[in-house]
Design a protein with these regions (language model features):
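Short glycine/serine- and small hydrophobic-enriched flexible loop segments
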Residues: 26, 119-126, 212-219
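Metal-dependent peptidase/peptidase-like ectodomains
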Residues: 158-212, 256, 261-263
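A short glycine/serine-rich beta->alpha loop
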Residues: 99-108, 194-199, 240
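Buried hydrophobic positions in well-ordered alpha/beta secondary-structure cores of metabolic enzymes
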Residues: 31, 48, 66, 79-82, ...
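Short glycine-enriched loops at secondary-structure junctions
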Residues: 81-86, 92, 171-174, 181-183, ...
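Acidic/histidine-rich catalytic neighborhood of metal-dependent amide-processing enzymes
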Residues: 101, 106, 110-183, 234
Length: 263
């Protein structure tokens, strides 16, 4: 029998505010750079087991997965929120709050969405709800940057041909993105002879050459087709040994080019 869950859900939300805040704080202060989500993923798995989601498990990509009614089904809907953040391990995950806001590196991308998803799972478990289709709740890994969607790729490999649709909770709840945005990532390495800034002056400097290349990138006219949008970004640039040494090995830059024209 179908149930009108509206009032039940609203009552649950009202009663769960403090629990959600506690979980948000506990998760937010756990460092979780892409590829290094181990501690946060382990926390999520333990939390799920603690609320009675006994079939939750962690796969080889560090996804934490809670399957419901998925056995033998090819109509699975995936709901996911990612565990990794863009912040490297050396960034302090310091929690701060005032009268209206909470602050912590990565809290909005994507820890708060992860918490909301987990609180939804708790409601389903507590009320013994069984969906009419297969459902996977996934705390997925390696969503950010050079994580390159490793977790989601693993999910589609393991459930090949069985996933009907995927909903990922990321960013603001005020918008829905229903069209995929493709991207290409490039690492550019530049190697030259280099040498001492005085004695080898005039020889090609790898850092200068890389800077010229990046400057020329900014002069490229981007395609404009209908309402589509193409962008680029130079995310990191590194290299060099000393202020008096013309870099003779390999500085590099990582370039991201997301484009709605390329899916």
């Amino acid at each position: 029998m179908k149930r009108d869950l509206t009032q039940e859900v609203l009552s649950y939300l009202d009663a769960s505010v403090e629990d959600a805040k506690k979980l948000l704080k506990e998760l937010s202060v756990i460092s979780a750079p892409s590829h290094f989500e181990d501690e946060r993923a382990a926390f999520v798995l333990s939390w799920l087991h603690g609320i009675g989601a006994e079939s939750a498990y962690m796969d080889e990509a560090k996804n934490v997965i809670y399957p419901i009614n998925c056995e033998g089904r090819d109509d699975i809907i995936v709901f996911e929120a990612h565990t990794d953040t863009v912040f490297p391990a050396e960034v302090p995950m310091t929690w701060r709050e005032d009268e209206t806001n909470y602050y912590c590196p990565g809290i909005g991308d994507d820890t708060v969405n992860l918490v909301n998803m987990l609180m939804t799972v708790r409601y389903i478990v507590q009320n013994h709800l069984k969906p009419c289709c297969g459902v996977l709740f996934v705390a997925n890994s390696c969503e950010e940057g050079l994580g390159n969607l490793k977790g989601t790729r693993q999910l589609f490999q393991d459930f090949e041909g069985r996933i009907d649709r995927l909903v990922t909770f990321d960013g603001s709840y005020r918008s829905v993105v229903a069209r995929a945005v493709g991207s290409h990532r490039y690492r550019i390495d530049v190697a030259t002879q280099g040498g001492h800034s005085w004695g080898a002056f005039g020889k090609t400097n790898a850092i200068v050459e890389l800077a010229k290349l990046l400057t020329s990138l900014c002069d490229v006219e981007l395609p404009a087709v209908g309402k589509s949008k193409t962008t680029y970004n130079v995310g990191t640039i590194q290299g060099g040994t000393s202020v008096i040494i013309s870099w003779l090995q390999t500085p590099s830059a990582v370039i991201l080019e997301p484009s709605k024209n390329k899916v």
